[in-house]
Amino acid sequence: YWHGYLPILRPLLIFFNVSQIRKILLFVFVILFVWLIKLLKEKLGIATSIIFAISLIIQGYFFVSYSLESAPVFMVMMISSIILLERIDKIKNLYLYIFIIACITNFVDYLTVPLITLGVPLLIYILYKQKNDNKLKCKDYIKIIVKASFVWIIGYGITWLSKWIIYDFIYNEGLIKSAISQVRYRSESYNEYKTATIQQIVGILLINNLEYIFFMFDFAIIVLLMMARKYQVKMKKISVYFQENLPIFLISLMPFVWYFALGNHTIMHLRFIYRHMLIFLIGILICLKNIWIIEKKKKSVTN
């Protein structure tokens, strides 16, 4: 394992103890949370910002600040999302940006939930383009998702491989051979220390998140009923809904691809790997939100 967060953590330990560092991290997490939600409200609307806020809270965002190993990847996710929203119209090459995010993620992350640094910014980018760019079609968004995912994998993989090569070149300890065997081991779905299979665990993660989704759906229905006097709610046409939400749904499935690809890692580290479902939770709630068209009722004119 590569502890890329240590160059930052060690200087901090000179001046602060672990408890104080956790308080600093919590403060940083709160600032990033408020900043991101504010930008989401401005760029994508209040409903989307609420979905992101509740999803982050449900997946234990603020508790992550107490984990020195898990906090860095969440900070990368939040900061990259904020920069994306701040400069979304000025970023000329999305794929270069995704590549840089992937490299930074691999450097600082302890193999916790790295996929959130791809899934969350990509959701934000697609949602923004759907709102502001009428020229792009469903197939265009799918191409963006596939290309961005491929670029992220390349950036993540190259950075990881370069660490092995540099270390092996300096110390000549056969690290590359050992690393390859570990990759094979981590991608297996069987583990001698666990009785649960990867399919069972993914099923549990799915069911747990569906509970949150149904709760949010019921809450949204109540809100809509309360708004019924001033607003009218329409269902979108199936074709329009499908075209709009297929890209979002595909991004939502990313955690399951990760779980099945790295079955052994998922089984062994369920205590934190469930946070990948943040991508699923946000994506599915966005899809549910997009079912409705909410319009302000026109006042009847009487003579």
Regions flagged by a language model, labelled:
Residues 94-121, 144-157:
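Membrane-interface alpha helices of multi-pass inner-membrane proteins
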Residues 268-290:
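Hydrophobic/aromatic-rich transmembrane helices and adjacent perimembrane loops
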Residues 145-226:
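Membrane-lumen/periplasm interface segments of specific transmembrane helices
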